[in-house]
Amino acid sequence: MKEFMEKAKESNIKAFELKFGQGAKIRGGHLEGQKVNEKIASVRKVREGETINSPNRFSFISSAAEALYFIQDLQENGGKPVGMKIVIGQQKPLEDLLKAMKELNIYPDFITIDGSEGGSGATYKSMADSMGLPLIPALLTFIDTANHYGVRDKLKVFASGKLITPDKVAIALAIGADAVNSARGFMMASGCIMALQCNSGQCPSGVATTNPHYQKALDPYEKKWRVMNYVISMRYSLFSLAAAAGVKSPRHLTREHIVFKDEMGKVVPLSELFPSVIGK
């Protein structure tokens, strides 16, 4: 805890997120030794060139209550927002988590719902393609279950998982997310060509490498304009979609604004397929 408190004092650290699950890496993190340079080795407290395997769970947490007590400790000792990231799978663990929040009156400052679409060139394909629910059903499940247990208003819900384009972001907001995360969008704006070399240290665009030779491909002074344009275009397009739907802000989009079409051409509003759940 002492080390955590010291890091929390860093002005450039705005919040902490505990990764309890990630769509692309259910097995946990894996960093090849060829990417572990002197700086990374110093931060991670390993030898330079040593492969790092991060477990997919916290060894001292075995229940929803223990997870929440740990989050509470970090909130109290760090003085900064502490959130959690999860992947939705079976219904029971989700219900256990939400019930524990209500019973203990302990809530993370935010909770990120990651869909199985979350990608990485440094994971097992079998896991990336098959573990966890895709974002739309995952988000629907979480929002409705949180409403059922009467805790939705206590939570800030972030959505993540291939939210690259404005229409996908609009759907996530309409389902009930408060905000979205987009890693892939910013990576592609920075030059990622999805070469699937993330784990090798030989990323040809310089985005996912610590090798100085390959890093030359990424000029931050040039790429910053592309990233800026991506953000501006995303925001403009989101508000354009909202205006077309007759609302003042993307935050005002609801399930009534989303329509799905089946293979026979029949259209059904999302609000009819998945009516909003009223809390207890």
At which residue positions do the language-model features occur?
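Active-site-facing alpha/beta catalytic cores
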Residues: M1-A100, Y107
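A structural-propensity feature for long, helix-poor, extended segments
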Residues: M1-K14, K19-G23, Q202, G206-R226
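Short helix/loop capping segments that flank catalytic or ligand/cofactor-binding pockets
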Residues: I26-G29, G121, R251
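Residue-level signal for pocket-adjacent positions within structured domains
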Residues: E38, N53, C198, K248, ...
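Short capping/connector residues at structural and topological boundaries
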Residues: A41, K45, S63, C203, ...
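Short coil/turn segments at secondary-structure junctions
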Residues: T51-F58, S126, L218-W225
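Glycine-rich phosphate/ribose-binding loops and adjacent secondary-structure elements
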Residues: F58-Q215
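C-terminal extensions of enzymes
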Residues: G191, D219-K280
